[in-house]
Amino acid sequence: MNTSLPRATAPFAGKTGRLVPESEGAPVPQVKAPTDAPNILVIILDDVGFGSFGTFGGPVPTPGLDLVAQKGLRYNRFHTTALCSPTRAALLTGRNHHAVHMGGIPEMANGFPGYDTIIPPEAATVAQVLRMNGYATGCFGKWHLTPMWEMGPGGPFDRWPTGMGFDRFYGILGAESSQYEPPVYDQTTPVSPHLGRENYHLTEDLVDQTINWIDRVSVSSPGKPFFCYLPTPAVHAPHHAPREWIDKFAGQFDAGWDAL
């Protein structure tokens, strides 16, 4: 796997002569991932405590996650900043959040070292590294890593997902949004996916978009691995749960968290 960013242009490997018969073209360079490169899916749920999941003995049943855990590994010791943007920045760059200028959230940016929320270009994301080594990359959900003054549809887009290694982006840029009428961006274009769709819910939309993208990559580029980053806005406030799920848990938490 290439470890230098950006990838250097390969020197000409053919030969040129005075005439065509004396010349030999070189193969057209194409970046391809290693044959054993795995697909990678990273799912982040916002503001969910370690003790909430049924997988770890919590009160919320999570059968899908339980199945994944049974077939993989469960970690019970980890460290985060307990803040949204710093944790995401550290996860995507592999660096301390202060080193990539994300000591707080973009809404609280200031001029002190490590807190201006301007991720420097030399801090490559895992998406940039993987894309330059033959991966398809997609981000679906909450980004929250763009400086506030760069969030408009007029750009600049350097620190939007599409400028930081993701071929495909569908989601929200900010900290929180309505699940029913969200300010969604498709790449860098603002869209209103809820219009004309009864019972629309952002989390369901994001999952559908993720599945569709993975299917398209698999069909259009067989054998090409993907890196998919799915940071859902849920369960961050505002807490807009679908009615069917509210009804499903009716009465179970009426006594409050102290009774659990």
In which residue ranges do the predicted regions lie?
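Formylglycine-dependent sulfatase
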Residues: 1-260
